[in-house]
Amino acid sequence: MGKVGAGDGSSAGLSALLAGAGLLMLLAPGVCSSLSCCPPQHPSSTPRRTLTPRGFPHPGPLGRAPATPPPLFMRPLFAVAPGDRALFLERAGGSRVSVATAARSGRRRRSGTEPEKIEPGEGASRSRRDMLKDGGQQGLGTGARDPGKATRFRMEELRLTSTTFALTGDSAHNQAMVHWSGHNSSVILILTKLYDYNLGSITESSLWRSTDYGTTYEKLNDKVGLKTILSYLYVCPTNKCKIMLLTDPEIESSLLISSDEGATYQKYRLNFYLQSLLFHPKQEDWILAYSQDQKLYSSAEFGRRWQLIQESVVPNRFYWSVMGSSKEPDLVHLEARTVDGHSIYLTCRMQNCTEANRNKPFPGYIDPDSLIVQDDYVFVQLTSGGRPHYYVSYRRSPFAQMKLPKYALPKDMHVISTDENQVFAAVQEWNQNDTYNLYISDTRGVYFTLALENVRSSRGPEGNVMIDLYEVAGIKGMFLANKKIDNQVKTFITYNKGRDWRLLQAPDADLRGDPVHCLLPYCSLHLHLKVSENPYTSGIIASRDTAPSIIVASGNIGSELSDSDISMFVSSDAGNTWRQIFEEEHSILYLDQGGVLVAMKHTSLPIRHLWLSFDEGRSWSKYSFTSIPLFVDGVLGEPGEETLIMTVFGHFSHRSEWQLVKVDYKSIFDRRCAEEDYRPWQLHSQGEACIMGAKRIYKKRKSERKCMQKYAGAMESEPCVCTEADFDCDYGYERHSNGQCLPAFWFNPSSLSKDCSLGQSYLNSAGYRKVVSNNCTDGVREQYTAKPQKCPGKAPRGLRIVTADGKLTAEQGHNVTLMVQLEEGDVQRTLIQVDFGDGIAVSYVNLSSMEDGIKHVYQNVGIFRVTVQVDNSLGSDSAVLYLHVTCPLEHVHLSLPFVTTKNKEVNATAVLWPSQVGTLTYVWWYGNNTEPLITLEGSISFKFTSEGMNTITVQVSAGNAILQDTKTIAVYEEFRSLRLAFSPNLDDYNPDIPEWRRDISRVIKKSLVEATGIPSQHILVAVLPGLPTAAELFVLPYQDGTRENKRSPEDLEQISEVLIHKLNQNLVHFELKPGVQVLVHAAHLTAAPLVDLTPTHSGSAMLMLLSVVFVGLAVFVIYKFKRRVALPSPPSPSAQPGDSSLRLQRPRPATPPSSPKRGSAGAQFAI
């Protein structure tokens, strides 16, 4: 599902309830262009679903509260719905009017990278028009006018009962938060603030309280502290008398708590910086708090004391237990990050979340930011092999992988709803880019079938995914969706939860009654269902639970959905027929259970009028709500079912105080409705009365009666006889043009459940499954329902063995879980034998005992042939898995000579630690090669054809790890080398690591240059690995910058003589540390340059040793068979004690000997 998203990243995250605190927020246009001025908010308490760019959408859990105002680029809005209500307003220059309603039921489907924000669901228009065309005098069609079909407008101005109150002294304040708890309470709280956009902080605040439904207000700054700056207002969703105020964390981190609806407060210090709150859905004093440093705290005393639950919690991935699904009401579900950056799913008790008491319901890691707990379901995502896999737990049972059609191959998925024990999901398949397919699940949320293809999606300003899908309030199973067909977007409607869809029939006439010529399927009505990038421009739809037949939306008539020529439409028969009500966008407020509709026009000008309709939009009357035109910033309806009081927030000018206009609609009603004031209305779909398997008859108030009604729901409901229309195709089946559900090409209907054993029974699907929540009875129910059938005996077939994570690798010394899968066969009476390939084998008597997998630990690395054999009385099957067992590669050391001869083969070896890590790939770079040499062996041989310094690099790939080492080698036609030794005290300070050897080599070279005066370019020193400490000294034929010929062999001999002399005279030494002198001297003659090796002997070193031995033997044989016998000469008088030189004595001649060659005395350099 990409991931389970945490709310709504678009700026339009509005809902009537914010955080269960009853907070509805408004920001004026242009005030906040980024999250810098308005930090992101968190999911609201309204159970709405939103989608994120990477994943599972997240329904804002009940009671989640934002810490700061959310960014909204919009105009003011209506806000009303059952329950508590509050409004957040923000004012800027050039205020515009917009009205929006937020309803719990009118849920739009959205997603975002940010927490879910309050969203208008009940009539919030989203575009701006300047004027209402008088009475709608511009028609949509031509022909004979039918006055009976025209929308009537009464232009006579009527007056509503209203009072105005100014929040004196707050003219500079540009934000306001309003809470109206309702439930027979007359208390309204308003928090106004001055937000400095340059500083990015709140600099002033005021708290106001009304006890007479908003007629008058009292300023409470002295009760909370005159110098206290308040930043946010929270209200307990289960007890509206409990209020919580958050101080500005820039100054202090404190909570002010009230238990008397904000009359008095007590201050409590916080030892953390609060970012969001989550109230418990039942216990009024239980709260979860998320801090800015990603720690989760709990309080059982309504914020008076806090206890740390868990650190490193993923933002918005914490939930209270769901009643009925969890036994413990104080259980907390959360997603936490491990030290190495992985995410895990944890549960624990709010006051006892110790390491020992934490549970891990999902084994292993989950994808980051992917946990969602919603109703009876828990969802997580796990990506393996480059593909996302989605898992669900129903009523906290073990997780099962969610099954889509085999070749859906989703690249993104979002859970839209989990209502009525069923999962509704939007899936973007491998071949889709800007559309999603809608899928609906069985009760357990495991098996999904297609409901609608190619539903339009778009990206919000924060990258959030928005799906054009709307669930109509008050009628179960009714949805509207915008589907993309041949690059045209059309609106479809369903009454049976996606089983059947059809286009919307356009109105027969326009506002004036002129006929509209629109023929299906070429022309239809199209509605805006999504929030646009500017969340309060065109695109609004509204419905109410208490008015199930009435839907108000903006849209257009034509061949496709358009962003131009937008009008307002209403349906009073649940979407069967529609009527145009305005030619410009208005926002709609439902009064008196939907018996009265209030419309307020979008305009940038101040207004003082609104429109009322008592007959479901057929006619409208003009009412004034204030004597002075007002720039409207927002409208808040009275909480509760009746909604007869409305407060309009605005200002007379850009510099004036906030003006609060209380509008009382009670005066427009004559009386309470009696039984004779109602008429019956039957829900239907194009004349079909059976909707979701039942006939439902509602009562509606007669249009000519102006009485206050009471909502009673459906007058009566009776089940229908089941027909084929009450059944959808089962998993693995597809509906064909004749209406039949037939198996998909990839599905084998004869496949049995793996739990099915000979003598048992299984449910044999007929290809159909009843639509969840459908109430039909009898009829074809028996014919289409899966029937129990005896399990036939079958030989094993389709055996597979895989690792639990789908990988072909395992780590040495760690558990690897192997899963045995069998398509067919009697799993209860099948013998399974598993050979791990390392000399260990196990047997099982049935497959059921292996459901959790077979765990095994490999002690050695290598490629192991894992075989599994299954047998029953009817046959057998086998499968093989080649498993690569590795261990982590920790270090790579490149071993090769320091100096080599031109055109001579050089051996390079990659020495590994540990030496056995499994299957490896070696990548070699050397010389001037532009392409590497790739081998499976750790050694290579090569030659250099030119002199100079060359770099060799080896990269070793082991699984996901790649390590490398680089060395430099000098190439010359000839050079001299000598082994060096040191005074024994150096060994005490030798840690035997490459860095130390490089530093000591540099010090020795410096000492040699200082003692001999030989240019440093002629000397190369390499300290060798191991103890005792030794080094190799190389004399190189350096060529200076004047491009003179390089040194001759005789010159190298002269340099060698000087070096040997100084070494023999003990003139080369260095100070390792204060008081520690190290003497450098020659060790012995070497026949070839040595190689920098690890303590283990390499092949090249052994070859050198053998070469020395063979040379020694050859010299011995030659001299043994000489005609003249060589007699030893007495020791040279010039030899010094400790002289490590080795003399090769010549046979004594009969004649006087010739002069010795240069350099014959002292140690000899190897050539």
UniProtKB/Swiss-Prot annotation:
It comes from the Eukaryota. It is found in: Membrane. Residues 1-33 form the signal peptide. The chain crosses the membrane at residues 1099-1119. PROSITE patterns: PKD (PS50093). Residues 111-133 have a biased composition (Basic and acidic residues). The keyword Repeat applies. Isoform 1 is highly expressed in brain, and at lower levels in heart, liver and kidney. Detected in newborn brain and in adult olfactory bulb and cerebral cortex. Isoform 2 is highly expressed in liver, and at lower levels in heart, brain, kidney and testis. Residues 802-893 form the PKD domain. Residues 38-68, 98-151, 1128-1167 are annotated as: Disordered. It is a single-pass type I membrane protein. Glycans are attached at residues 184, 352, 433, 775, 815, 846, 907, 928. Belongs to the VPS10-related sortilin family. SORCS subfamily. This is VPS10 domain-containing receptor SorCS1. It comes from Mus musculus (Mouse). The gene is Sorcs1.
